[in-house]
């Protein structure tokens, strides 16, 4: 007998694959635990974006130094490579709900600590750098753990929808977080802005506390060892679909990481002021939100690999056209296309991860996923800046366009299994490529 409550657990309908063709945009929110995770993720991700904006603002306010801003970015990036795998391993060997609660509590304490130091006048730049590094380390544990839970709460037929909704959280947070940070800094002191940020972790913790996470079957459990610690890398190596998508993202987004060059394009090429620069910076997020909305309306995608390849190719072409554009409105549109393409391939990558990764490996696999995904931005910022100094900003992005286009077309031709990878029906055949 089916439950009358519209909020159901994923275990109730694990075999409801026939529903995937007509899913509503909010279908995954019918599942109680996924909806709780969704709301908690919204508060956590918004708070993360708020804090990042507040940290950069305060460092510049205290030092007036661009070099110190660079150190802030370094403090944020180093923990990614130092403790990234450790965070994913914890997600697979420690109770995930407790792990989420601990990392959320840690984020709250960092925000409250920075707020206290600022309001008392004791704050120094190094305090903010340490707080940034601590926050980054906590989030390296929090984010893979949170992502690993998605497929525990919805059936496979809902995975694309669930991941798309999760992507909408990220896209929304990139708007809401910086906006709230700016408003809080304008309306109150920096110290109270940090305390305001800390409040966002309370509803997130409440949502996580109410989660009912299905226990992992005994046969899937394993003991901790160095071999298990490296399980995420071994999984990637043995799954050509996932490995290819991760490397495509790392390379194409890395060599085509345009964001550090936007101030140059705004001032020297498009001749627009701060307002124009703000519009250029926001355009990719608008495109990303449109991409997420499109996937939510369509539902499950039969040819996930093919859509990912088209998205990578569109990103490369859009990047080249943006590099050549001298018109502000055309550039604005092209940046929206870049955000749209990046959003589509990101959802396809994450969905493929969930489809192909066993639950006992999911935390470690998503830790590697995050290392490559976020590492692409750090490596890309260095690469495009160096090339821009040598051959100019347009030349740097044209190089990224060329590399991205060649790499995507090569994978398209050489890996037919990637093109065919899609829903559950084609999953097994695509694994072997």
Where are these regions (language model features)?
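Transmembrane alpha-helix termini and helix-breaking/packing motifs in multi-pass membrane transporters
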Residues: 57-63, 115-120, 176-196, 268-270, ...
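Hydrophobic core of transmembrane alpha-helices in multi-pass small-molecule transporters
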Residues: 42, 123-141, 250, 330-344
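Helix-loop junctions on the cytosolic side of multi-pass membrane transporters
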Residues: 148, 152, 190, 194-224, ...
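Helix-terminus/helix-capping segments at the ends of transmembrane helices and short amphipathic helices
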Residues: 60, 150-155, 160, 267, ...
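Cytoplasmic helix-loop-helix junction between adjacent transmembrane helices
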Residues: 131-172
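Intracellular juxtamembrane helix-capping segments at the cytosolic ends
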Residues: 55, 141-154, 344-357
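Helix-loop boundary and gating motifs at the non-cytosolic
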Residues: 19-79, 234-282
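C-terminal transmembrane bundle of multi-pass solute transporters/carriers
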Residues: 2-6, 72, 82-86, 93, ...
């Amino acid at each position: 007998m089916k439950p009358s409550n519209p909020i159901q657990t994923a275990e109730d309908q694990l075999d409801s694959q026939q529903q995937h063709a007509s899913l509503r945009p909010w279908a995954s929110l019918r599942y109680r635990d996924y909806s709780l995770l969704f709301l908690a993720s919204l508060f956590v991700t918004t708070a993360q974006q708020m804090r990042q904006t507040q940290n950069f603002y305060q460092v510049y306010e205290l030092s007036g130094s661009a070099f110190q801003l660079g150190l802030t970015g370094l403090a944020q990036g180093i923990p990614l490579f130092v403790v990234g795998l450790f965070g994913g391993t914890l997600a697979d060997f420690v109770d995930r709900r407790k792990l989420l609660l601990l990392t959320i509590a840690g984020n709250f304490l960092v925000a409250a600590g920075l707020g206290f130091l600022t309001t008392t006048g004791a704050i120094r730049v190094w305090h903010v750098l340490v707080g940034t590094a601590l926050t980054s380390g906590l989030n390296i544990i929090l984010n893979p753990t949170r992502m690993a839970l998605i497929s525990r709460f919805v059936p496979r037929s809902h995975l694309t929808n669930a991941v798309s909704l999760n992507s909408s959280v990220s896209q929304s947070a990139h708007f809401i977080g910086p906006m709230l940070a700016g408003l809080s800094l304008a309306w109150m002191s920096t110290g109270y802005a940090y305390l305001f940020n800390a409040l966002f972790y309370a509803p997130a913790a409440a949502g996580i506390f109410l989660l009912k996470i299905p226990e992992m079957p005994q046969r899937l459990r394993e003991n901790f060892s160095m071999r298990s610690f490296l399980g995420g890398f071994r999984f990637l190596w043995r799954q050509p679909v996932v490995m290819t998508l991760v490397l495509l993202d790392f390379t194409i987004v890395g060599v085509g990481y345009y964001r550090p060059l936007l101030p140059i394009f705004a001032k020297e090429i498009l001749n627009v002021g701060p307002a124009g620069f703000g519009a250029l910076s926001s355009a990719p997020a608008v495109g990303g939100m449109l991409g997420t909305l499109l996937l939510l309306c369509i539902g499950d995608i039969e040819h996930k690999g093919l859509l990912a390849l088209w998205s990578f190719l569109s990103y490369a072409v859009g990047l080249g056209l943006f590099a050549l554009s001298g018109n502000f409105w055309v550039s604005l549109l092209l940046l929206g296309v870049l955000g749209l393409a990046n959003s589509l391939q990101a959802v396809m990558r994450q969905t493929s991860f969930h489809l192909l990764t066993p639950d006992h490996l999911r935390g470690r696999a998503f830790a590697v996923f995050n290392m490559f995904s976020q590492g692409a931005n750090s490596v890309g910022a260095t690469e495009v800046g160096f090339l821009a100094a040598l051959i100019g900003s347009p030349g740097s992005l044209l190089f990224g366009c060329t590399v991205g286009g060649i790499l995507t077309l090569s994978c398209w031709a050489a890996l037919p299994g990637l093109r065919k990878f899609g829903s559950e029906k084609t999953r097994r055949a695509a694994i072997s490529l």
